[in-house]
């Protein structure tokens, strides 16, 4: 389920909407659903081709759609735009969300070439535009922590941040965040 959500968020961030009218609404909800359905089917095929005992849970699609909507809500928050129902989002508003996205599914590699990772999203930090700050966002589709991040997740975020620091200008501020789409929470 997580991979389908991740890939759908990336697809929507990279969606070419240049041929649409800026005032058009009613498209994002159906587009999000169609994108997730496509990615859901891809994951189902991969799951079926992999030898394992559990069964695919088709009934989890609505949970995945909620997760996708949660991740989109966090993107709206980071773009400093009011969270709207997806059906009322205009093309112009989604372009503003897309404008903060610097990269999706970016491969990270240390200068020595021995350490690697893959970030989900790299976005502009609009809270600190003066310093041209960036946020390394790792989408989390599992259960969010009750109080603070687990040591493993915290270490993963710091690892991604440190790998990314090797690839940006020295003066550029950078932080890593875990985005839990389940309850739309963000952890640093």
Where are the regions a protein language model picked out?
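A non-catalytic, helix-rich entry segment at domain boundaries
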Residues: 8-102
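Mg2+/Mn2+-dependent nuclease catalytic core
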Residues: 97-188
